[in-house]
Amino acid sequence: MTIAEIKNTVEGKMDQSIEAFKHNLTKIRTGRANPALLDTVHVDYYGAMLPISQVANVSLLDARTISVQPWEKGMGAKIEKAIRDSDLGLNPSSMGDLIRVPMPAMSEERRKELSKVVRGEGEGAKIAIRNLRRDANEAIRKAVKDKLASEDEQKRCETDIQKVTDRHVIVIDQLVAAKEQDIMAV
């Protein structure tokens, strides 16, 4: 693998790590309603456990309420039970064929707890980025050892990869700060 290929590959993988981190952040509850919050909740649909989004229309009713509109009449009670039994601390209420899921206000203690979870997720993402940097640097050293690149190219490439790593770590820090601010907002 050439030096340029190594640099492009590591940058692509770092971008994927950032996207995965962003996806993980959407699952962490803030004070506002977010339909993605119910992505982790699965409901029994004729023997198969499916995400709610595959058996109902999930949307926002207002800033603090998620509405779930089942596609089949008989699924309302099952969806309501699945949401109630999830560990999200939500209490859905059924209004005919529409299920309303109000978001309860979080206590200060719960906000701090979620803030710690966000920081932990951020640290995990940074570790993933650093591991990618380490793997890329090892691949570069191997290329130099196999006489596919010079030592000058190695130093230049390692510097470039460090800059890319620093950029991605800054993005993670910004995402963590924004999510913490979102969580701590009353």
Swiss-Prot record:
A single GO molecular function term of this UniProt record: ribosomal large subunit binding
GO terms for cellular component: cytosol
A Pfam family assignment: RRF
Record-level GO BP terms: cytoplasmic translational termination
Signal sequence residues: none
Localization per Swiss-Prot or TrEMBL: Cytoplasm
Principal location listed in the UniProt entry: cytoplasm
Keyword list, A-Z: Cytoplasm, Protein biosynthesis
Keyword ATP-binding: no
Origin superkingdom: Bacteria
Family the entry assigns: Belongs to the RRF family.
The protein's role, per its UniProt record: Responsible for the release of ribosomes from messenger RNA at the termination of protein biosynthesis. May increase the efficiency of translation by recycling ribosomes from one round of translation to another.
HAMAP family referenced in this protein's UniProt entry, alphabetically: RRF
This protein's name: Ribosome-recycling factor
Gene: frr
